């Protein structure tokens, strides 16, 4: 028994075999030390931040985070959430709202953390083949 009928695919199929595994997931917790951020920004192409609630990071690391975003503008930063069914919205809390002013980052909104990780690894590994701007690719494919 099939619940979802198969739909024939008529377009040409493209296979992308490259993944950029230089992606780091950092989970925001109370008491996180700012010094860990520098190491992450220095060593990874993408930093996925699993933030508090729908969009919060601790005030204690906010200034360091802003500075590192400025110092490493080529790093892709994606803000995600620990709240499974609400998605991310960085404008809800003051720190997140300020981050939108000072840092360039993408938001996962309603994407699961697993899909964000897979998508980012795929995007960065196939950047040239995909062409275009990473933000457009992240939100469209």
Residues covered by each model-derived region:
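Accessory alpha-helical/coil subdomains and C-terminal extensions
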Residues: 1-56, 140-141
